C-alpha cells in the first residue's frame, strides 16, 4: 500500500511536469490543487518552471511564478530557468523571468551565464534584452571565455556586432571587423577573418575595415588586413581609397605602408580629388613630399579645376605652398572659373600665402572668368591686409570686371567702409562708371549702405549722376525703400524730380513699391506729384495700378489730382478699375474720382468693369453715379461689353440699373448682336427676359440670327429660333441667315434653318441662292443638303467671284498699359518679382483681334470686308506672366467649326507645351499648344481654393511599373501626369486627351486607365455621362464637342472628380461585361451576337465582374496568310483569365465558315477536322494555343458549337483538315490579329548636296512634332506629308522610289523600317537625280512588304516629292560627316558579321548612322561616355554650324580616346542609357532592346514642358557679386559664400584618432580566448521524465535534434560564416560616407550576403578566394587539395609564393613595427599567415607540369610552425608529437600526390589528404582523429566557362583503418554514376 501511494505521488509529480512541459495549464493547476509540490523536479533537477521556460509556454511560466515557485532553483548543471529560456531562445519567457526578478548574471556550474548561452545559439533578441537589463558581457566562464568569444567562435555575426557595439556612445552600429579595425584589435580581427576570410567587407556607407584603420591610424590592424588580402585600392562609389584617408589624416607611416603595398597614387574620388589634394588641403607637408616623391600628379584637377596648390592656398598652409612651388607647381594655375591660387588666398584672407605667391611671381592682376581680379575679391570679402598687399605689389586699382565693376564698385555695394576709404585714399575715382554707367554711389544706394554713401559724397561723388537709363542714386534708394539713404541723398542736394528715360521720378518708383516712408520723405522735399511718365501716368496712377492704398491716401492728402488724365485720357480710377483694385476704387470715389471721366475712345471706368466682370467695382461706380448707358466714341455701352464677354451677372446688374438693352452703337449693333457673335446663350436669355428685341437690325440690316448663323453658334441659333426670330430676314444685300450659314460652310446650321422654315430659294440682291454660294466655295456637305430642297429654276448663274458678306463689328482699342518697366529692369535686386518685365507687353484684348475672328479658312484669295468686332486693348494683370509661359496657352475658340475641306494653312507654331495654370472658383481651361486636342477644363465653383493645375507627358519606360498590357492591347496616347496628385474637386472636371488609335476592323474600343501611385493601374469609371456635360460646365463659356466630333478628331474625354497620378488611353478589343453573382447569368457579345457565355447557379460564390470578348477573324486575312488550308471562328475570351468556376460554365461559339457550309460529323476527337483550341495563359503573357478537342465534348446547334469549361480562358474553333498544323496556323494568324492599329502620318524631308545628289529622310510618326526633329537643325526641307494612315504596331514598312529619283543602293537591297508607336521611326535614303535636265522629283511609295514585280501590292501611302534647290556648302558638310578614317584605323570596331559588307565597312556604316540620328542628344551621349565639359565645349566651338558635325567629332574623339578598347557594345550601352535605344534597334534589330534593356539610373521622367523664359535685362548685380568666381554656375569653388571646400569638408568633422578611452568598450576587458583553447559549448538540459509512459513526441524530437547537433564536431565556418556584409550604397557626396560611417545614429545593418563575384579578385591575400587562389583556411574547416582549370591560377600561385617569401624580407611591414609591436603580435608576425589554429592547406589551380611549383609551395608551407587545438588535458609533449606527425603526413601526402599524377592528368587528380579533426564525444570531451581523404572522381560542371569549376567526390575515413576507406570507395563508385556529392561539413 505505501508503495502504491508513493507510486501514485511520483506519477502525479511526473504528470504535473509533463503538463508544464506541454503547456497544459488547466491540467497543471489541477495537479497543484491536488497537492502536488510546485517545486518538484525530474531526475536532472528540472522543475516545471524549467520545462515551461524551455518550451516557451509564457502563460504557464507566469502562472507558476504567481504560484510562488522558487525562481532561482537550479538544475544539476546549475542552470536556472533564465539559463534554459536563453539557451532555447524563448525571448518572451526571458522577459517575464527578468521582469519577475531573475538574476541576469547567474552562473551555472561551469560559469555559463544566460547571456553566454543566448550568444552561443545566435538568439539576437535575447542578447539585446539581457544587455539592456543589466547583463554583464565581461562575466567569463571557468575557462575564461566571454559571450563575445563564443559568438565569434560560432560565427554569429549579428550577435558579435551587437556585443562589440553595445555600450558605445555614438550608437554607430558598424560591422564587427570595422569595430576591430577602429580599436586596433588584431585578435578580434584575426578571429573574424578566420570565420569569414573576406577582409573587404563593406559597411552601409561602402567603406572597408582598411578605410577605418587608415582613418584611425591603426597600423597593427592595417597590416593584418593587408596580409589577409585586403584590397589596398578598394574604391567605394564615392571613390575614396584608404590612401586618400591616410593622406588627409596625416599619418606618415600609414601612407608609406599603403604605398609600399601598391596603393595607386593617382586614384581619384568622385569629385576627382587625388591623395595629394587631401594632403595639401590639410597642410601635411611630409605626406605631400612623400606623395610627390612617388610621382603624384602635381597638376591634377578636381571636377571644378582645383589643383593641390589651390587647396594649400585655401587652407593657409604656407609650407605646403612652398613645397608645391619647389616641385614646380604652376603658380598661376586656373580652375574652371579661371581662379588662380592668389584668387583663393584673397578670398580666404590668407595674407601670408598671398605674400609668398606674389613673392614667387604670381600675377596680381589675373582675371577670373567673369573678370574679377584678386583685388576685387579681397575688397568683396573685406580683407584689408590682403588688399593693401595686392596694391603694393602692382594690382590695378582701376581693374574692371566683365560688367565694368571696379574694386570700388564692389566695396561700395558690399558696404565695406574701411576698404572704400583705403581705395579712395589710394586714388580710386569716386565717379567711375560700369557698363551701365553706374557709379559707386549707385551701388551704395541700391544696397542701402548709408555710411559708405556719406563718405563717397564727402569725396565729391556726384549725387545726381545718371546711369544708362538716366536713373540716379535717388531712384535706386527709392526703389529699395531705404528711407535713411533717401534722406541723406536729398540733404546732399539730390534732385527729387529728375526723371528716367521713361519719365519716372523717384516718387513714381516709391509709389509703385509702396514705400510710404520714402514717399513721405520725397514729398517733404517738394517732389512733384504732377510729373507724368511718357504714358502720362502720375504717381497716383502708379499707386492705383499696383493697389498701394496707403501711398494713394498719402498722395491724396498732399493734394494729388484724383482725375488727372494721362496720355490716353486715363484717370487713376480707370487704372484702378482695370487692375481690379477695389480698395483704391473705394478710396478715389469719395475723394473726387469721377466715374464719368471718359478715356480717349469714350470708355468710362464702368466700361472696363463691365468688360472684366468686376461686379463689386461696378456696384461702387453705379452707386457714385456711373451711367449704365454711357456711350463710347462708337456708341458702345457697358452692356455691350458685358454681353459680348458672356457675363450674365454683370448684364443683369446693368439692366437693373436702367441700362437700355436695345441701344445700338453707331453701326446699330445691339448687345444681342454681340451675344450672337460670341454664342453666350445664358446672356441672351437674360436679355430676352428684359425685353430686348430679337430681330433688331444693324445699319446693314443684319439681325442677331444672321450673326449667329455667320459665326456658327448653333446653340444660339436654336435659342433665337425658339424665341420667334425671323428665319428669312434679309440684309440690305438680300442675304438671309441661310445665305450666311451657306457662305461660312456650317452644314448643321443650314440643316437647322431649313427645318425651321428657311427658304432655300431666296436670292440675294445679286441673284445668288445659298446653293450657288456653297457650290462656289466648294462646301460639299452644304451643297448636298441644299441641292435636294433648292428649286432648280431659281438657280441663277453667278460670276466666278463671290463677294463675301460679313456682319458689322466694332474696332475700338483702349491701351491701359503704362511704359514704365523698361528702365526699371536694371533695378532688379534680390527678391524682385516679375513686375520688372517690360510692361508694354501687358496688353489686354477685350475681344479677339482681327486675325482671330472665326472665318472659313477655305477662301484665302477672296477679298473680305473688314469684320466689325469690339477690340479693346488693356493692360492685363501681371500674374499671368509669373505663373506660366504665355506661349503655352491657346485661347479657346467660341465655336467648333464644321468644315468639309482641309485647311491649307498650317496651324501656328507654339514654342511651349502647357505645364500649369492657376485656377480658382471662377474656373478655367487650358489647351496644349504642342499637342493639339489636349485640354483640361475646370468648371466654375469646382475648386475649393486657388489651385495650380499641372499637366505633363511621361514616357512609359520612365515608369517603375508601366501599364500592364496584354498582347492585343496597346497604349493609344501618351501617359498624362496631372497635378496636384490626389486633388479632389467639388464637382466633375473634364480632361480631353488626344489619341492615335485606329478602330481597325471595328472590333476595338478605348479604355481610360488610371494609376494613383504609378504601380497599380485600373480602369477609370465615372458616374457622369455625356448627358451631364451642360450641368458639369456650370454656365462656363467653353465649347465641348459631341462624341462624334471627338471621335473624328481622335480625342478621348475623361470626366473625373479627382486627379490620379497618371491617366492613359488604352486600345483593346471590345468587351461586354456584367456583374455575375451566385444566382448565375449570361453574357452576350454585341460585336458577334452568336457568341454567348452562360453562368449556372453557384458558378461563383460572390458577385464578381466578368467580361466576354469576341474577336472576329476576317476571312480575307485568313486567305492571305493561309490560303484555303484552314478557316477559323471568332476568338472568344472570358475575362479575367485563369479563373476557376465552382460549376462548369457554358460557351457558344459560331462554327468556322467552311464547316458551316459543309458540315462533317463523321469523326470525333483526333479524327475530326474541327479543332477546339485553347490558351489558358493570363495577364500580359503571350498566348500559347493547344488543341483540347479530344478532352472537350462539342454539341452543334444553329451553326454554333456549345461546350462547357471550368476555367476562363481564350477559345477558338478551327476547321483544319491537317489537324497537326492547327496550332501552328492559329499561332501565325493570332500574331497578325493582335497587332494594335494606329493612325500615323508619313513625313518626307529632303536636302540636295549637289545638283545630282541628295538625301531623303522619311518619318512614320504618331504624335511626334516635325519641329523637334533633327532635320529641322540640318537644313532639310519638308517636301511631302501624308494624311493619317492606318499602320500596325511592329509592321515592316518598305519604301519604293520611282520617277526622276533613284535610290543609291545595291540592286537587291530595299529600304525598310519598322513602325513603333510614339517612337521616332526614321528611314534615311540617299538619292540621285536620274535626268538632270528634268525636274528633280518622283514618287515615293510605302508598302507592307518588299516589292516584287510579279505580285500586286496594296500601297499604304503614295507621295509625290520634289527635291528642294541645292544647298550651298553641302559638299563640305558631306566630307565632315564621314567618320570612316578612324573606324578604318581601329580594327576593334570591325565586327565581322555575315553579309555583303566587311566588318570595317559595317562599323563605318554604323558610326555614320549613329552620327546622323544623334541630333541634339550628342552632348548627352558625350556626358555618358565620360567626356568633360571642356571636351564638349571644344566640340561645339570647332563645329559650330551643324549637329551632324558635332556628332561625328564626338564619335571620332571617342574612338581616338578608347583606341583598341573602342567597342560598339559600349557605344550601344551608352545610347540605351540616354534613351536613344531606337538607334540601336535600327542598327541591330529589335531583339537587342529586350536583351540590353537596363534600369535607367540617371534620368528622371522627361516631359515636354519648357521652363518659363528668363526675364530680359541685365543679370542681377547681387547675383554677380555674391558669386563672382562662379559666374552663375553651380560648380563648387572655394569662393562660394561661406562654402568651405566642398569636396573634403565633411572629413573635417571626423574626430581625431581615438585614444585608449574611445567610445568603444575596452577590448582588454573583453577577453578573446588564448591560443590553443576554444570556448566551451553549452548543451541543453535533459528534459526527459522518469516513469513517463507517453513522452511528448515533439519534445523527444527536439532533444534528439539538439543532442545530435552537439555530438557533431564544433561548428566551423561552414555552419555560420561571419559574413559582415552590407549594402554597398554610398552617399553622393565624396566624403559623406566616411563621416556617416563613424558618426551616424544607430541603424540596422543589412543581412544581405555579398555575392562572390563582388569580392576583389585582384587582392593579393591568401585565403581570400577559395576558387582562384592557394587558400589557407583557419579553424575547424576541413581542407583538401583541389585542382581547377582556371587560367589565372598560375599567376595567383606565383603571387602567393612571393608573399610567402616576402614575410621575412626586409621590406615587409615587420620593419615598421619591430619596436612598437607587443610580444604576442610579434610572435604572430614571425609565424606567418598560417599560424592561426589548426590551419590546413588547400592547393588548387596549378598548371600542367607545375609539380615543382607545387612542391615549392608545399615545402614553404610546411616550414612554418603549425598549431592545432589540443584537448584540455594535453601536455606540451603531446602537442609536439602530434605536430611532428602531422608534418610527416603532409610530406607523405605531397609525395603521394607527385607520384600518382603524371602528364596531362596532373591537373585533374589530386592525391590523398591527411588531416586531423576534432569531434565531441557523448561526454562532451574533445576527441582528435586523423582523417584520410581521397578524391575518386572529378566532375566538370561547366566546360563553357573560362574558369572552369570542378565538383569533387570525396570519400573519407579515419587514418587508423585505411582498409575501410578503400571499401567505402568501392561502394561509393557503384552509386556515383549519376550523382555528385560534396564533402559533408
Curated annotation (Swiss-Prot):
**One MF term in GO for this entry?**
transmembrane transporter binding
Q: Where are the ANK repeats?
A: 44-73, 77-106, 110-139, 143-172, 174-201, 205-234, 238-267, 271-300, 304-333, 337-366, 370-399, 403-432, 436-465, 469-498, 502-531, 535-564, 568-597, 601-630, 634-663, 667-696, 700-729, 733-762, 766-795
Instruction: Tell me the superkingdom of the source.
Output: Eukaryota
Region: UPA domain, residue numbers: 1234-1362
Q: Which residue windows does the record flag with biased composition (Basic and acidic residues)?
A: 1493-1504, 1588-1612, 1642-1658, 1772-1781
InterPro entries in the record, alphabetically? Answer: Ankyrin_rpt, Ankyrin_rpt-contain_sf, Ankyrin_UPA, DEATH-like_dom_sf, Death_dom, Multifunctional_ANK_Repeat, ZU5_dom
Q: Where are the annotated segments for Disordered?
A: 875-904, 1486-1510, 1583-1613, 1637-1703, 1718-1791, 1840-1859
Sites of (3S)-3-hydroxyasparagine modification: 105, 233, 431, 464, 629, 662, 728, 761
List of residues that carry (3S)-3-hydroxyaspartate: 695
Q: Name one Pfam family in it.
A: Ank_3
Q: Which PROSITE patterns match?
A: ANK_REP_REGION, ANK_REPEAT, DEATH_DOMAIN, ZU5
Per the record, which residues fall in region 89 kDa domain?
1-827
Q: What job does this protein perform? A: Component of the ankyrin-1 complex, a multiprotein complex involved in the stability and shape of the erythrocyte membrane. Attaches integral membrane proteins to cytoskeletal elements; binds to the erythrocyte membrane protein band 4.2, to Na-K ATPase, to the lymphocyte membrane protein GP85, and to the cytoskeletal proteins fodrin, tubulin, vimentin and desmin. Erythrocyte ankyrins also link spectrin (beta chain) to the cytoplasmic domain of the erythrocytes anion exchange protein; they retain most or all of these binding functions.
Name of this protein: Ankyrin-1
- Tell me the name of the encoding gene: ANK1
Amino acid at each position: 500500500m505505501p508503495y502504491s501511494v508513493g507510486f501514485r505521488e511520483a506519477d502525479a509529480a511526473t504528470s504535473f511536469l509533463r503538463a508544464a512541459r506541454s503547456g497544459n495549464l488547466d491540467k497543471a493547476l489541477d495537479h497543484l490543487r491536488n497537492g502536488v509540490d510546485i517545486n518538484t523536479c525530474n531526475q536532472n533537477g528540472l522543475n516545471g518552471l524549467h520545462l515551461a521556460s524551455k518550451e516557451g509556454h509564457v502563460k504557464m511560466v507566469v502562472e507558476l511564478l504567481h504560484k510562488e515557485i522558487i525562481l532561482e532553483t537550479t538544475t544539476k548543471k546549475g542552470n536556472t530557468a533564465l539559463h534554459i529560456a536563453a539557451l532555447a531562445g524563448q525571448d518572451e519567457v526571458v522577459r517575464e523571468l527578468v521582469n519577475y526578478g531573475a538574476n541576469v548574471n547567474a552562473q551555472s556550474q561551469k560559469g555559463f551565464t544566460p547571456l553566454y548561452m543566448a550568444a552561443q545559439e545566435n538568439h539576437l533578441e535575447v542578447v539585446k534584452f539581457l544587455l539592456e537589463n543589466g547583463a554583464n558581457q565581461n562575466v567569463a566562464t571557468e575557462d575564461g571565455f566571454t559571450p563575445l568569444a563564443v559568438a565569434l567562435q560560432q560565427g554569429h555575426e549579428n550577435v558579435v556586432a551587437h556585443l562589440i557595439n553595445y555600450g558605445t556612445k555614438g550608437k554607430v552600429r558598424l560591422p564587427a571587423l570595422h569595430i576591430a579595425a577602429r580599436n586596433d584589435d588584431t585578435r578580434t580581427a584575426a578571429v573574424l577573418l578566420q570565420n569569414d576570410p573576406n577582409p573587404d567587407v563593406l559597411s552601409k556607407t561602402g567603406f572597408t575595415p582598411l578605410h577605418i584603420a587608415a582613418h584611425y591610424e591603426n597600423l597593427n590592424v592595417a597590416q593584418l588586413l593587408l596580409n589577409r588580402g585586403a584590397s589596398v585600392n578598394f574604391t567605394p562609389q564615392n571613390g575614396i581609397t584608404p590612401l586618400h584617408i591616410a593622406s588627409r589624416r596625416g599619418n606618415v607611416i600609414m601612407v608609406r605602408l599603403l604605398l609600399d603595398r601598391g596603393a595607386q597614387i593617382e586614384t581619384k574620388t568622385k569629385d576627382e580629388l587625388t591623395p595629394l589634394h587631401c594632403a595639401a588641403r590639410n597642410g601635411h607637408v611630409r605626406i605631400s613630399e612623400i606623395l610627390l616623391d612617388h610621382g603624384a600628379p602635381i597638376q591634377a584637377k578636381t571636377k571644378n579645376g582645383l589643383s593641390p596648390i589651390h587647396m594649400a592656398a585655401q587652407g593657409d598652409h604656407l609650407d605646403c605652398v612652398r613645397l608645391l612651388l619647389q616641385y614646380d607647381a604652376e603658380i598661376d594655375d586656373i580652375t574652371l572659373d579661371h581662379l588662380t591660387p592668389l584668387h583663393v588666398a584673397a578670398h580666404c584672407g590668407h595674407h601670408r600665402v598671398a605674400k609668398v605667391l606674389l613673392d614667387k611671381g604670381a600675377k596680381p592682376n589675373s582675371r577670373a572668368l567673369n573678370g574679377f581680379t584678386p583685388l576685387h575679391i579681397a575688397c568683396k570679402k573685406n580683407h584689408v591686409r590682403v588688399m593693401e598687399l595686392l596694391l603694393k605689389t602692382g594690382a590695378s586699382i582701376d581693374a574692371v570686371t566683365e560688367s565694368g565693376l571696379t574694386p570700388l564698385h564692389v566695396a561700395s555695394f558690399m558696404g565695406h567702409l574701411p576698404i572704400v576709404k583705403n581705395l579712395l585714399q589710394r586714388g580710386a575715382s569716386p565717379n567711375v562708371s560700369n557698363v551701365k554707367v553706374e557709379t559707386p554711389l549707385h551701388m551704395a544706394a541700391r544696397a542701402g549702405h548709408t555710411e559708405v554713401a556719406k563718405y563717397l559724397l564727402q569725396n565729391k561723388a556726384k549725387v545726381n549722376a545718371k546711369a544708362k537709363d538716366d536713373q540716379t542714386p535717388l531712384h535706386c534708394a527709392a526703389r529699395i525703400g531705404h528711407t535713411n539713404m533717401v534722406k541723406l541723398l536729398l540733404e546732399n542736394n539730390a534732385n527729387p524730380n529728375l526723371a528716367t528715360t521713361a519719365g519716372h521720378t523717384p516718387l513714381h518708383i516709391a509709389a509703385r513699391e509702396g514705400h510710404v516712408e520714402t514717399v513721405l520723405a520725397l514729398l517733404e522735399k517738394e517732389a512733384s506729384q504732377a510729373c507724368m511718365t511718357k504714358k502720362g501716368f502720375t504717381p497716383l496712377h502708379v499707386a492705383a495700378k499696383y493697389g498701394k492704398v496707403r501711398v494713394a491716401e498719402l498722395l491724396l492728402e498732399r493734394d494729388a489730382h484724383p482725375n488727372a488724365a494721362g496720355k490716353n485720357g486715363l484717370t487713376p480710377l480707370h487704372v484702378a478699375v482695370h487692375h481690379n483694385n477695389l480698395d483704391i476704387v473705394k478710396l478715389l470715389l469719395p475723394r473726387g474720382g469721377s466715374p464719368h471721366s471718359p478715356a480717349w475712345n469714350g470708355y468710362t471706368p464702368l466700361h472696363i468693369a463691365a468688360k472684366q466682370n468686376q461686379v463689386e467695382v461696378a456696384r461702387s461706380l453705379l452707386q457714385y453715379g456711373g451711367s449704365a448707358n454711357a456711350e463710347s466714341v462708337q456708341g458702345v455701352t457697358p452692356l455691350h461689353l458685358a454681353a459680348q464677354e458672356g457675363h450674365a451677372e454683370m448684364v443683369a446688374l446693368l439692366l437693373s440699373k436702367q441700362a437700355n438693352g436695345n441701344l445700338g452703337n453707331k453701326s446699330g449693333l445691339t448687345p444681342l448682336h454681340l451675344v450672337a457673335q460670341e454664342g453666350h446663350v445664358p446672356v441672351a436669355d437674360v436679355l430676352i427676359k428684359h425685353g430686348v428685341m430679337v430681330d433688331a437690325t444693324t445699319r446693314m440690316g443684319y439681325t442677331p440670327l444672321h450673326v449667329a448663323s455667320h459665326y456658327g453658334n448653333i446653340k444660339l441659333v436654336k435659342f433665337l429660333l425658339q424665341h420667334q426670330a425671323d428665319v428669312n430676314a434679309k440684309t440690305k444685300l438680300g442675304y438671309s441667315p441661310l445665305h450666311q450659314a451657306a457662305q461660312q460652310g456650317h452644314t448643321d446650321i443650314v440643316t437647322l434653318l431649313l427645318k425651321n422654315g428657311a427658304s432655300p430659294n431666296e436670292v440675294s440682291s445679286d441673284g445668288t441662292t445659298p446653293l450657288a454660294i456653297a457650290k462656289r466655295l466648294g462646301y460639299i456637305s452644304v451643297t448636298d443638303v441644299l441641292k435636294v430642297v433648292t428649286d432648280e429654276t431659281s438657280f441663277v448663274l453667278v460670276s466666278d467671284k463671290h463677294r463675301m458678306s460679313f456682319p458689322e463689328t466694332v474696332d475700338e482699342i483702349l491701351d491701359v498699359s503704362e511704359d514704365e518697366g523698361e528702365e526699371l529692369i536694371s533695378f532688379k535686386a534680390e527678391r524682385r518679382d516679375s513686375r520688372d518685365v517690360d510692361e508694354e507687353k501687358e496688353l489686354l484684348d477685350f475681344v479677339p483681334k482681327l486675325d482671330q475672328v472665326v472665318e472659313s479658312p477655305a477662301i484665302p484669295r477672296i477679298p473680305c470686308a473688314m469684320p466689325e468686332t469690339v477690340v479693346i486693348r488693356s493692360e492685363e494683370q501681371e500674374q499671368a506672366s509669373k505663373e506660366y509661359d504665355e506661349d503655352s496657352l491657346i485661347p479657346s475658340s467660341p465655336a467648333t467649326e464644321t468644315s468639309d475641306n482641309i485647311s491649307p494653312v498650317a496651324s501656328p507654331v507654339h514654342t511651349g507645351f502647357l505645364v500649369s495654370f492657376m485656377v480658382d472658383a471662377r474656373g478655367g481651361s487650358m489647351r496644349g499648344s504642342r499637342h493639339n486636342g489636349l485640354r483640361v477644363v475646370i468648371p466654375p465653383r469646382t475648386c475649393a481654393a486657388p489651385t495650380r493645375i499641372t499637366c505633363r507627358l511621361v514616357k512609359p519606360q520612365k515608369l517603375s511599373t508601366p501599364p500592364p498590357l496584354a498582347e492585343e492591347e496597346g497604349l493609344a496616347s501618351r501617359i498624362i501626369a496631372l497635378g496636384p496628385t490626389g486633388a479632389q474637386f467639388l464637382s466633375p472636371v473634364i480632361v480631353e486627351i488626344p489619341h492615335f488609335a485606329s478602330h481597325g476592323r471595328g472590333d476595338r474600343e478605348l479604355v481610360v486607365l488610371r494609376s494613383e501611385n504609378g504601380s497599380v493601374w485600373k480602369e477609370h469609371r465615372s458616374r457622369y455621362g455625356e448627358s451631364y456635360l451642360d450641368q458639369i460646365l456650370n454656365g462656363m463659356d467653353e465649347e465641348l464637342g459631341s462624341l462624334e466630333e471627338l471621335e473624328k478628331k481622335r480625342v478621348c474625354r475623361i470626366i473625373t472628380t479627382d486627379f490620379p497620378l497618371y491617366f492613359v488611353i488604352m486600345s483593346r478589343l471590345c468587351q461586354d461585361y456584367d456583374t455575375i453573382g451566385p444566382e448565375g447569368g449570361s453574357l452576350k457579345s454585341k460585336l458577334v451576337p452568336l457568341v454567348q457565355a452562360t453562368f449556372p447557379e453557384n458558378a461563383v460564390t460572390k458577385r464578381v465582374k466578368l467580361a466576354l470578348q469576341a474577336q472576329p477573324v476576317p476571312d480575307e486575312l485568313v486567305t492571305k496568310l493561309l490560303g484555303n488550308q484552314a478557316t477559323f471562328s471568332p476568338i472568344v475570351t472570358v475575362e479575367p483569365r485563369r479563373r476557376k468556376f465552382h460549376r462548369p460554365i457554358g460557351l457558344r461559339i459560331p462554327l468556322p465558315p467552311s464547316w458551316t457550309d459543309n458540315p462533317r460529323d463523321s469523326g470525333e476527337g483526333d479524327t475530326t477536322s474541327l479543332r477546339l483550341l485553347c490558351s489558358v495563359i493570363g495577364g500580359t503573357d503571350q498566348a500559347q494555343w493547344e488543341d483540347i478537342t479530344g478532352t472537350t465534348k462539342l454539341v452543334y446547334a444553329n451553326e454554333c458549337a456549345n461546350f462547357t469549361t471550368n476555367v476562363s480562358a481564350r477559345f477558338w474553333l478551327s476547321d483544319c483538315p491537317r489537324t497537326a498544323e492547327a496550332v501552328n496556323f492559329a499561332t501565325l494568324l493570332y500574331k497578325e490579329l493582335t497587332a494594335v492599329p494606329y493612325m500615323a502620318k508619313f513625313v518626307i524631308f529632303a536636302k540636295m548636296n549637289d545638283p545630282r545628289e541628295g538625301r531623303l529622310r522619311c518619318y512614320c510618326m504618331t504624335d511626334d512634332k516635325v519641329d523637334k526633329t533633327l532635320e529641322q537643325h540640318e537644313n532639310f526641307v519638308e517636301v511631302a506629308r501624308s494624311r493619317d494612315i492606318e499602320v500596325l504596331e511592329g509592321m515592316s514598312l518598305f519604301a519604293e522610289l520611282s520617277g526622276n529619283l533613284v535610290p543609291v543602293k545595291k540592286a537587291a537591297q530595299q529600304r525598310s523600317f519598322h513602325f513603333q508607336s510614339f517612337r521616332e521611326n526614321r528611314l534615311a535614303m540617299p538619292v540621285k537625280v536620274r535626268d538632270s535636265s528634268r525636274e528633280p522629283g518622283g514618287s515615293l511609295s510605302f508598302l507592307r512588304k518588299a516589292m516584287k514585280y510579279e505580285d500586286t501590292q496594296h500601297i499604304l501611302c503614295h507621295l509625290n516629292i520634289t527635291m528642294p534647290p541645292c544647298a550651298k556648302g553641302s559638299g563640305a558638310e558631306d566630307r565632315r560627316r564621314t567618320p570612316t578614317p578612324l573606324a578604318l584605323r581601329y580594327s576593334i570596331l570591325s565586327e565581322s558579321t555575315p553579309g555583303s559588307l566587311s566588318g570595317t565597312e559595317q562599323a563605318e556604316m554604323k558610326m555614320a548612322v549613329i552620327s546622323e540620328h544623334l541630333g541634339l542628344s550628342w552632348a548627352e551621349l558625350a556626358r555618358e561616355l565620360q567626356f568633360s565639359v571642356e571636351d564638349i565645349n571644344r566640340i561645339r566651338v570647332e563645329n559650330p554650324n551643324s549637329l551632324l558635325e558635332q556628332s561625328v567629332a564626338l564619335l571620332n574623339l571617342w574612338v581616338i580616346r578608347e583606341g583598341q578598347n573602342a567597342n560598339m557594345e559600349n557605344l550601344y550601352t551608352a545610347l540605351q542609357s540616354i534613351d536613344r535605344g531606337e538607334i540601336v534597334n535600327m542598327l541591330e534589330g529589335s531583339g537587342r532592346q529586350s536583351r540590353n534593356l537596363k534600369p535607367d539610373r540617371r534620368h528622371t521622367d522627361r516631359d515636354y514642358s519648357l521652363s518659363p523664359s528668363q526675364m530680359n535685362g541685365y543679370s542681377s548685380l547681387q547675383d554677380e557679386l555674391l558669386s563672382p568666381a562662379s559666374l552663375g554656375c553651380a560648380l563648387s569653388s572655394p569662393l562660394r559664400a561661406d562654402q568651405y571646400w566642398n569636396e573634403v569638408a565633411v572629413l573635417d568633422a571626423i574626430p581625431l584618432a581615438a585614444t585608449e578611452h574611445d567610445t568603444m568598450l575596452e577590448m582588454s576587458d573583453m577577453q578573446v580566448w588564448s591560443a590553443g583553447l576554444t570556448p566551451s559549448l553549452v548543451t541543453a538540459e535533459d528534459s526527459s521524465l522518469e516513469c513517463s509512459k507517453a513522452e511528448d513526441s515533439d519534445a523527444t524530437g527536439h532533444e534528439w535534434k539538439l543532442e545530435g547537433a552537439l555530438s557533431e564536431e564544433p561548428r566551423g565556418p561552414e555552419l555560420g560564416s561571419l559574413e559582415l556584409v552590407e549594402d554597398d550604397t554610398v552617399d553622393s557626396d565624396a566624403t559623406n560616407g566616411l563621416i556617416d560611417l563613424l558618426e551616424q545614429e544607430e541603424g540596422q545593418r543589412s543581412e544581405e550576403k555579398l555575392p562572390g563575384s563582388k569580392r576583389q579578385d585582384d587582392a593579393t591575400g591568401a585565403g581570400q578566394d577559395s576558387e582562384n587562389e592557394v587558400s589557407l583556411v583557419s579553424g575547424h574547416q576541413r581542407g583538401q587539395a583541389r585542382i581547377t582549370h582556371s587560367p589565372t591560377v598560375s599567376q595567383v600561385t606565383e603571387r602567393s609564393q612571393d608573399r610567402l617569401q616576402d614575410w621575412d624580407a626586409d621590406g615587409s611591414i615587420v620593419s615598421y613595427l619591430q619596436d612598437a609591436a607587443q610580444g604576442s603580435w610579434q610572435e604572430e608576425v614571425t609565424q606567418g599567415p598560417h599560424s592561426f589554429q589548426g590551419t590546413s592547406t588547400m592547393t588548387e589551380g596549378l598548371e600542367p607540369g607545375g609539380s615543382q611549383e607545387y612542391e615549392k609551395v608545399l615545402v614553404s608551407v610546411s616550414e612554418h610552425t603549425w598549431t592545432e587545438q589540443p584537448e584540455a588535458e594535453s601536455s606540451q609533449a603531446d602537442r609536439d608529437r602530434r605536430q611532428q606527425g602531422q608534418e610527416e603526413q603532409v610530406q607523405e601526402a605531397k609525395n603521394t600526390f607527385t607520384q600518382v599524377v603524371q602528364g596531362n592528368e596532373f591537373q585533374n587528380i589530386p592525391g590523398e589528404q591527411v588531416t586531423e579533426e576534432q569531434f565531441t564525444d557523448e561526454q562532451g570531451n574533445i576527441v582528435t582523429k586523423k582523417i584520410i581523404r581521397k578524391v575518386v572522381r572529378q566532375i566538370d560542371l561547366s566546360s563553357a566557362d573560362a574558369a572552369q569549376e570542378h565538383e569533387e567526390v570525396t570519400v573519407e575515413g579515419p587514418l587508423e583503418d585505411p582498409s575501410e576507406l578503400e571499401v567505402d570507395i568501392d561502394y561509393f563508385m557503384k552509386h556515383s554514376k549519376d550523382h555528385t556529392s560534396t564533402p559533408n561539413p
